[in-house]
Amino acid sequence: YVAEVAEETIEEAPIPYTLVEEKPSFNGGDANEFTKWVFSNMVYPEVARENGISGRVTLQFTIEADGSLTNIKVLRGVDPSLDQEAIRVVSMSPKWTPGRQRDKAVRVTYNFPIYFQLRN
């Protein structure tokens, strides 16, 4: 009787790139296209509006090789209501065209500022 022990291999996802030969794109455009999409889907939180809270929320997320967004987190927040709205909107994003390195789709880390500004 011989017992065999199979070595278990855990395949870890490759670390996302920050610089790539071909940047990810949104709807065939650049970051400005994504900014337009974010603002068309954003709802200014009532509590922030009532308290006159505005500012810039900086998010970081990973654009996966399949174009989906993951690991969405706040790098620099303003107020929990604005931070949560920024995460909510970005998490609804349609798929991107992924970044490419050596002609292969790769994961890319992306930092994205969202400006919340009250208008009178």
Predicted features along the sequence, with ranges:
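A sequence-level signature for low-complexity, intrinsically disordered linkers and tails enriched
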Residues: Y1-Y17
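Short proline/glycine- and basic residue-enriched helix-capping loop/turn segments at helix->loop/beta transitions
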Residues: S25-Q60, E85-N120
